[in-house]
Amino acid sequence: MTDDSRSRPQEPVPVEVAVVGAGQAGLSAAYFLGRAGFEPGPGFVVLDADAAPGGAWRHRWPSLRFGAAHRVHPLPGLPLGDVDETAPAARVVADYFAAYEARFHLPVRRPVRVTAVRPAAEDRLLVESAAGSWAARAVVSATGTWTRPFWPYYPGRERFAGRQLHTADYRGPEELAGRHVVVVGGGNSAVQLLAEISAVTTTTWVARREPQWREGPFDEQAGREAVARVERAVREGRPPASVVSVTGLAVTPAVAAARDRGALARLPMFDRIVPDGVAWDDGRFVPADVILWCTGFRAALDHLAPLHLREPGGGIRMVGTRVAREPRLHLIGYGPSASTIGANRAGRSAVREIKELLARPGVPAALPLTARRPPRVA
């Protein structure tokens, strides 16, 4: 008799709350779930696609120093402590996240890449992955944007003879030395990378519009106003603008130095790409060995496609952190909670609403599923 148990699909593991993603937003939600009395394992699980702690920060370019990164707010319950601001941001944040997971005994399973979330029996949501599946009473999706770099199309892009890369591919200025680099984009990454690259080689900056520069400090009131503007968009079902698009760009010493050497003399967007550069309809031409697309990212929400959440305008309508069309699902790290401080607040808010939802009469507390150990993760 042949034992074919290995080929049989595992039954879903019942869990109260499944958190998808272990970046700033996911860890914040996990912390507040523990504080709210959810037990690690049967109460909640965190499913992370990466092989180690750190979220998107693990993949930031090595030359990005912690002191030059967007302000990183500490996770709830554990200060960052004294940090060497000249250390690579990727290492500092990854070490901090690892310590955080250990300190609060968070049930993070990795690498687990969630491929789909879909309706299941008994008012559950089925969270699917190659490592197994979970039947959750509520889901917190905190998958961020790093895995979905946005590459805008311009005529001739496929015929460019040089190298094209995105912010997500950038590893440092040294590999670009001696080549003329056209940097495309008007956000924080574009300006940061221009400041680095223009110190070692020639550059041209191309962006649709001049960014809003911020010379002074960004206080708490300005932060609240910026978040409110992004929140208004998602409440109306529109795709969210990036938080930095409403906060403006800080003029750091490195940015000021780049400005002084002429690297921030912006050209409008080109009309097409030619094999040896970029061109405008008015006859202008700039040669290029490299085109660096600092054109941002989109929310990584493909795993939610089976739930049909999109509004006609392309966005997902939100009520706070809750998806209007699916009250068992919360999105954090999306829209107004895309910043580190926004993610912390969103984690607290999502857990509060989940606890209220699961306490309502008629919401089943258990499923007739065979209790099994969680799927093993290599």
Cite the ranges covered by each PLM segment:
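Flavin (primarily FAD) cofactor-binding/catalytic cores of flavoenzymes
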Residues: T2-D50, G55-A56, E85-A378
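Glycine-rich loop at the start of a catalytic domain that most often binds anionic cofactors/ligands
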Residues: W61
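Glycine-rich flavin
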Residues: L64-E85, A233-E236
